[in-house]
Curated annotation (Swiss-Prot):
Gene3D superfamilies for the chain: Ribosomal protein S11
Role description: Component of the chloroplast ribosome (chloro-ribosome), a dedicated translation machinery responsible for the synthesis of chloroplast genome-encoded proteins, including proteins of the transcription and translation machinery and components of the photosynthetic apparatus.
Pfam families per the UniProt record, alphabetical: Ribosomal_S11 (PF00411)
Protein name in the entry: Small ribosomal subunit protein uS11c
Subunit field text: Component of the chloroplast small ribosomal subunit (SSU). Mature 70S chloroplast ribosomes of higher plants consist of a small (30S) and a large (50S) subunit. The 30S small subunit contains 1 molecule of ribosomal RNA (16S rRNA) and 24 different proteins. The 50S large subunit contains 3 rRNA molecules (23S, 5S and 4.5S rRNA) and 33 different proteins. uS11c interacts with bS21c.
Chain spans, region Disordered: 1-24
CC per GO annotation: chloroplast; ribonucleoprotein complex; ribosome
Lineage: Eukaryota, Viridiplantae, Streptophyta, Embryophyta, Tracheophyta
Entry-linked InterPro entries: Ribosomal_uS11, Ribosomal_uS11_bac-type, Ribosomal_uS11_CS, Ribosomal_uS11_sf
Source species: Spinacia oleracea
Annotated localization: Plastid, Chloroplast
Length: 138
């Protein structure tokens, strides 16, 4: 009979206090992923560990409203509000995707008071890789 493998750590008893409030982050990276259907804003520290995130869907927007610039602005504001309280002053911004929320999210980040060291477009561009899907006929 095989021995049961003991659990090393479970999620329930792992954390006693909130880790997010304990960390002080002076510098971070803000990732904005803007698709036509949604905008996701993730704030990480310089090592890549996620500190805060928000999307248009988590901000209460549903359906086609998630792809709007206003939804992206709200998502960026919600994600950044928590890290400003933790003491973030400088950030780099990585924008990915062709969505409508790119500029609106960047505008909300600029208004938050965080100094931006650079803004980089990291949208993946194929060097003629995969064949695209066929054109829609409506």
């Amino acid at each position: 009979m095989a021995k049961p493998i003991p659990k090393i750590g479970s999620r329930r008893n792992g954390r006693i206090s909130s880790r997010k409030s304990a960390r002080k982050i002076p510098k971070g990276v803000i990732h904005v992923q803007a698709s036509f259907n949604n905008t996701i804003v993730t704030v990480t520290d310089v090592r890549g560990r996620v500190v805060s995130w928000a999307s248009a869907g988590t901000c209460g927007f549903r359906g086609t409203k998630r792809g709007t610039p206003f939804a992206a602005q709200t998502a960026a504001g919600n994600a950044i509000r928590t890290v400003v309280e933790q003491g973030m002053q400088r950030a780099e911004v990585m924008i990915k995707g062709p969505g409508l929320g790119r500029d609106a999210a960047l505008r909300a980040i600029r208004r938050s008071g965080i100094l931006l060291s650079f803004v980089r477009d990291v949208t993946p561009m194929p060097h003629n890789g995969c064949r695209p899907p066929k054109k829609r006929r409506v």
